[in-house]
Amino acid sequence: AGPHHLHYTALPDWATTLGMVFSVMLWMPSWGGMINGLMTLSGAWDKLRTDPVLRMMVVSVAFYGMSTFEGPMMSIKVVNSLSHYTDWTIGHVHSGALGWVGFVSFGALYCLVPWLWNRQLYSLKLVNWHFWISTIGIVLYISAMWVSGILQGLMWRAYTSLGFLEYSFIESVEAMHPFYIIRAAGGALFLVGALIMAFNLWMTVNAGQASETEGAGALQPAE
């Protein structure tokens, strides 16, 4: 599926077309995994209201599904002709990197640290703050890049009636400036969330109460 990243380059057309076909095929196993992950919670969805760690893990699976839908869609040549080399690709990658990989890593750390140190998690309230601050940050980040990327693609392919480019490259860069501000704000919020997690885990290890139970019981808050 890798050649779909090289549409409209020196790579032979047949190779990129083959990559597109395999990329579209990846919808099935990717969404099979996502559906399997979400349906594991069947009958226990009420836990999402009280367990922010579980909520973070479930949202990571949702971001995985969104990212793995968007990737094959962007591999289709008619879509890629607009998205290629634009910020849309950056938005797509970061919906997976921050939303999927980031959140599943955070959730794993929130589970593993109390288990490894046999401590109660210092504060579920801080986990909840981490979840919402980081989620807002991710949404701001990727939404700004989606809009920025589509705008870039449309500006780059706009021609005058005489066949000249309607916008210069620097005009397209200037048009991106507001979206880059939003992107920076989103990234800063995501970082703040990660710092909250670092503090929470540090306090869990150094000031958390010893857990009387093994495994998942250690996820009960100490406060």
Model-derived regions: residue spans:
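Short hydrophobic "helix-edge" motifs at membrane interfaces and signal-peptide entry regions
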Residues: 82-85, 177
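Short, highly charged, low-complexity non-transmembrane loops/tails of multi-pass membrane proteins
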Residues: 209-223
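Non-cytosolic membrane-interface motifs at loop->transmembrane helix junctions
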Residues: 11-23, 49, 84-90
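Hydrophobic cores of alpha-helical transmembrane segments in multi-pass integral membrane proteins
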Residues: 1-7, 18-40, 54-77, 90-116, ...
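Inter-helical turn/loop segments and adjacent helix faces that build the functional surface
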Residues: 41-46
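Short, intrinsically disordered/low-complexity patches at protein termini
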Residues: 120-122, 214-215
